[in-house]
C-alpha cells in the first residue's frame, strides 16, 4: 500500500501500520526535527523495526536524507530495505568503489616504496555517480552510504559547472558536443559502447551516461542543430522514449575545467620550488631528486592529458583550497535542508573519528622522504571536528548508543517493544573447554530443523580454522571477515538465508544490524575474554542477531562471568521482561519475522551468472513437464552426447553428461522430479557443473 503525506515528495510503500513503540518514536523524532533539534537518538532493540521508523520519519518530513552505515554489508541491507519502502523515489548507494586497494606507502626501515594498486568495481562507481546526480536533481533523494562519504571527491562547484545540458532544436555543433564530452572525461570508442563512452556515426552521436547502466542517449543533429533526442537500450538498440532535453553528467567526480587545471599547474610548480629549496638546505639530495622527477612527470601529464596517476594528491591545488582546509566530500553535495541518519552510531561515530589519523600517519612518510609534496596531506578524509560542523540535523540510531550520542542528543526516542511480540533470546552459559564440540552438536540440531547459526570468534585465523573443522565433519559452513570483498559478503549472507549452508562464522561483521531472520542460534566463543569484541555493547549487538527468531538462543562459552557479560545479560533480561509484559497486556503471541530473500544490491551477480540461472530455470521447467516416456528419450539423447564428448576427449563434459543421466535415472526410478536437483549441462568443455549446495 502506497502512502503519501502532505507536502512530501516521498511515496511510502507501507505493508502494515506502525505498531508497538513505533508510532510514539516516529512522533517524537518528527516533532524534534520540526522544532529544530540538531541531534536526536533512536534507541531501538534488534527487531523492533528501526528502519521502518526512520522510513516513516523521512516520508513525513519530505526532506532529502543521507543514511550512514558502519560497513558495506549493512549499507547494502539498508539500501535494499529503503528501495522497498520507497520504490518510486531516488534511493541511492554510495560506498567505496574499490574491490581491492593498496595505498601508496613508504617504509623507511627497509627503504621500501609500495606503489598504489587498486581494482575498481564498475557497478559501484556507477551507483556513486547516480547518487550525486540525484542530490543535484531531486528533492526525494535518500543516499545510503558508508564512512567513505567523508573522503574527498570532486568539488561540487566544478562538477556542476561541467554538466552538459542538451535541448531539442538547440544550436550547437557536433564538434562542440564532442569537446564538452571529452572535457567531462568521456572517451570516444566506436567499437565497445560502455559507460562513460560516446560514438559518432555521421550526424548521430550516441552517449552512454556514466551514472546509468541501462539507458543511453542518441543525439541526432542537422546543420549544427539538435534535431531529436531519444533514449535507447545500449545492448539491443531499441528506442525507449523520445526526450526534448537531457542532462549529461561528468563521467567522474574528479573532473576539472581546463582553466582550473592550468591554474593548478602553476601553484604546484610554486610549491615544488619551495620544497626543493627545503631539501637542498637540509642536504637531502636524494629526496630532492626523487620529488622533482616524480612531480615534473605528473605536471607534464596534467598539461597534456588533464590528469595523471595519483591526481588526488594534487586535489588541494585543483580545488583552490588553502593548506589545512577540509576537502570537498559527498556531504557538500547535500541540500541545506537534508537530514543525516547515523545507523549503528556507537560504531559509526568512532569510525569517523579514526579515519583522519590513520591516513595522516601513512602520508607523512611519503612527504618526508620526497615521494609527495606537502599538499598531498590535504588529500584526506574529514577530521571529526570538521565533520561535526558539516552535520545537518542528525538522528543517531542504535540499540546501544554510546556516551557521545547520549550527551549530544536533545531527546532520546525509545523503541524497546517489538510489534511481532518476539522476546530477546534465551542466554545459556557453557564452559570453554568443550566449546567446539558442544557447538557442533547444537549446530546439527538446528540444521535438522532448517534453522541457521551464527558463530563469532576472536580472530580471522580462528574463524577459518573453525570453518575447516566443521566442514571436515560434514557441516555446511562458511566464514565472513574483512578480507572478503563487498559483493561476496552480500552473496554469502544471501546464500545463508537461502539455506545453501547452515553456519556462518565471523568476528566483527556478525554484529550491528545484520538482518537474518532464519538465525535461531548465536554461539559466542571465548565470551569471557574481556576486550573490544567482548564488551557489553558488542555482546548485546551479537546476541541481538538471534532476536528475530521465535526460538532465538545465545550460548556464551565462558569459564567465568565478566562484568561485561553480567551487564549484557541483565540488559537483555530487562528487555525480555518488558516485551513479555507488553505481550500479556495486548494478548500477543510471538511470531517469527518473514522477509523475502532478495538481492541486496542490483548487479552484484555478473551476466554469466545470471545467464546460467536462466538456463537452469529453463531446464528445470522442461524436465518437470516430461512424462516417463519423454524422460527415457532424454536419457538416450544424453547418453549419445556423453559418448560423443568422450570420443572428442572432452572428458569433463562427458562426466557432466554422466552425472545428469544418473540424476534423471534416479528420478525416473522413483517417479519424482525435484527441480532443485536438476543441474545444467554446459555446452562447452572446461566449465564447472552446477553443484548442489553444500558440496
Curated annotation (Swiss-Prot):
The gene is uvrB. It comes from the Bacteria. Residues 435-601 form the Helicase C-terminal domain. SMART domains: DEXDc, HELICc. Keywords: ATP-binding, Cytoplasm, DNA damage, DNA excision, DNA repair, Excision nuclease, Nucleotide-binding, SOS response. Residues 31-414 form the Helicase ATP-binding domain. The UvrABC repair system catalyzes the recognition and processing of DNA lesions. A damage recognition complex composed of 2 UvrA and 2 UvrB subunits scans DNA for abnormalities. Upon binding of the UvrA(2)B(2) complex to a putative damaged site, the DNA wraps around one UvrB monomer. DNA wrap is dependent on ATP binding by UvrB and probably causes local melting of the DNA helix, facilitating insertion of UvrB beta-hairpin between the DNA strands. Then UvrB probes one DNA strand for the presence of a lesion. GO terms for molecular function: ATP binding; ATP hydrolysis activity; DNA binding; excinuclease ABC activity. Residues 632-667 form the UVR domain. It comes from Nitrosomonas europaea (strain ATCC 19718 / CIP 103999 / KCTC 2705 / NBRC 14298). This is UvrABC system protein B. GO terms for cellular component: cytoplasm; excinuclease repair complex.
